[in-house]
């Protein structure tokens, strides 16, 4: 799988070119719902974080990782993105069935399946994904499609972003991944510590560790975790190491918060490693940073899988869940 992750910069640049026809597809919409599960939902998390940095007065962007949103839309005519690599994700198909009738603009991000059929039947826009790859490895295509749809709100120049992504130093990133994997391999559990716009990165690392390396992890999101999770340090020494995920940006208190937390971790004898990024270079650079950090996490998780004796491609519990959920829903129909 390493070769697939190392292809990401090339794929992302290709995807930006492929999806240029979607540029601005969701501009001017005040409310946007993004329905997607697992790796397909991850791109929505990243776009939500990017909007919080570069378009705080922009559209309300709601990521739905369920059969339906927790609250129904307030107005008709909202934007809707339905992301499912296979096109058959039950939760996403159901979310689309519920939300599409009142939506003003709908985009299906998929390689095929039921979602593509629905798009053709109902005249939705489609960001067609390449087939034959693992869903979680399709992340650069998902991110490129979503970025193109909201390039204006994000302040992204697709041509400039294409050049930035294509110039990423994959060998340097591979070295970072090896260091991260070596650190995490010393512990039974990884503690992932972050704040603000680092949250989608930490969630992605958690998921990559689970799917590829079959390794449990714990997620601490600050400042909230300072009121609960941090107390586990009392019994943490030797049990877990901590990965601190920083994204510095103008006006953020997160760097100060994480600096304090890292000091406390060390007082309790817990080893730490930092993954640092910056949003000060503008939206193009930040999207490229998100892509590069996520690539590092993918490579590190594959390396960990091999160190731990697991096949990173296989996910038997997910297969069982999908099969049994389908059976359960059919029995209720």
Curated annotation (Swiss-Prot):
Name of the protein in its database record: Bifunctional phosphoglucose/phosphomannose isomerase
Similarity section: Belongs to the PGI/PMI family.
Active site location: 211, 227, 322
Reaction catalyzed: alpha-D-glucose 6-phosphate = beta-D-fructose 6-phosphate; D-mannose 6-phosphate = D-fructose 6-phosphate
Subunit structure: Homodimer.
Top-rank taxon: Archaea
Entry's Gene Ontology BP terms: carbohydrate derivative metabolic process; carbohydrate metabolic process
Function comment: Dual specificity isomerase that catalyzes the isomerization of both glucose-6-phosphate and mannose-6-phosphate to fructose-6-phosphate with similar catalytic efficiency.
SUPFAM superfamilies membership: SIS domain
């Amino acid at each position: 799988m390493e070769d697939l992750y190392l292809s990401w910069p090339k794929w992302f640049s290709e995807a930006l070119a492929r999806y240029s026809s979607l540029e601005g597809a969701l501009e001017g919409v005040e409310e946007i719902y993004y329905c997607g599960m697992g790796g397909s939902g991850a791109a929505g998390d990243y776009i939500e974080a990017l909007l919080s940095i570069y378009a705080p007065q922009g559209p309300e962007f709601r990521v739905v990782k369920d059969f339906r949103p927790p609250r129904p839309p307030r107005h008709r005519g909202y934007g809707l993105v339905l992301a499912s690599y296979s096109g058959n994700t039950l939760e996403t198909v159901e979310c689309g069935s519920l939300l599409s009738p009142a939506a003003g603009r709908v985009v299906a991000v998929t390689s095929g399946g039921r979602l593509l059929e629905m798009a053709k039947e109902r005249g939705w826009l489609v960001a067609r994904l390449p087939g034959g790859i693992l869903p979680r490895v399709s992340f650069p295509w998902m991110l490129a499609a979503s970025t193109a749809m909201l390039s204006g709100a994000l302040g992204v120049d697709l041509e400039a972003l294409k050049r930035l992504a294509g110039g990423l130093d994959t060998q340097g990133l591979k070295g970072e991944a090896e260091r991260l994997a070596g650190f995490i391999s010393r512990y039974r559990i990884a503690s992932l510590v972050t704040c603000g716009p680092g949250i989608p990165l930490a969630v992605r690392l958690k998921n990559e560790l689970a799917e590829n390396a079959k390794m449990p992890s714990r997620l601490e999101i600050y400042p909230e975790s300072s009121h609960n999770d941090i107390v586990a340090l009392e019994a943490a020494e030797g049990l877990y190491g901590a990965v601190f995920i920083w994204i510095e940006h103008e006006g953020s208190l997160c760097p100060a918060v994480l600096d304090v937390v890292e000091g406390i971790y060390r007082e309790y004898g817990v080893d730490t490693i930092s993954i640092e990024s910056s949003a000060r270079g503008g939206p193009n650079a930040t999207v490229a940073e998100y892509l590069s950090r996520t690539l590092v996490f993918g490579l590190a998780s594959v390396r960990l899988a091999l160190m731990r004796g697991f096949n990173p491609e296989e996910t038997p519990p997910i297969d069982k869940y999908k099969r049994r959920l389908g059976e359960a829903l059919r029995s209720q129909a």
